Amino acid sequence: MEPGVAARVAAVADPVLQGMGYRLVRIRISGESGCTVQVMAERPDGTMQIEDCEAVSRALSPVLDIADPIDRAYRLEISSPGIDRPLVRRSDFERHVGHLVKIEMAVAYQNRKRFRGIIKGVEGDGVRITRDDVAKDADPDVVLPMADIGDAKMVLTDELIAESMRRGKAAEREKKRDLGLAPPLAPHAKPAAQAKPKPKAKDGKPAKKPLPTDTKKHRLAADRARRGEIDPD
């Protein structure tokens, strides 16, 4: 596909996504088995459910048909970035500080194009990573110019999976709150018992606890009273 087509699709898709509360991650156009336009999007919190993809597809498809940024038949595909997502913006690197990343440079840096390491932070126009594939006597830290990065992708790790699950659960709770649905009660949980009101005090003195009236002593006294042996009063 000719250069600039992805940019034209992005110019059409980005306003639609922003209006729906999503963020455009990447446009990828493939010519294999026909033309496929892949629109990768996400929520502000980095999540994207199947329902979100369906909503974006319904909204974006007619807009692309009218704008017609591609001069041939194509298949529209809406996808989420996934756990091992690409990093394309400054905010992507900032959000994933502490995680492992693979970077392919479009322009060689220090005579190499491939880097792998932990993201330490963003400094100016570069991203600092601590490489995990250097010799013991070499400095593992390197700052790569973001403008020269051709492709950057997260490496699937247990830590990344755990964070993705946490974000997914948080997004699900937020969705339920937006719909006004309370989270279901856990099977083992019981409703909290309501405290019974305490007897009110009279004349500034604590109220006395009522004495029991159904003890053995009371029953014997009542029996003798019925036989006329004692006065029940």
UniProtKB/Swiss-Prot annotation:
GO BP of this protein: ribosomal small subunit assembly; translation
SUPFAM superfamilies documented for this protein: YhbC-like, C-terminal domain, YhbC-like, N-terminal domain
InterPro entries: Ribosome_maturation_RimP (IPR003728), RimP_C (IPR028998), RimP_C_sf (IPR036847), RimP_N (IPR028989), RimP_N_sf (IPR035956)
Protein name: Ribosome maturation factor RimP
HAMAP family linked to this entry: RimP
Subcellular location as annotated: Cytoplasm
Entry keyword Transmembrane helix: no
Keyword Membrane belongs to the record: no
Region described as Disordered: spans on this chain: 167-233
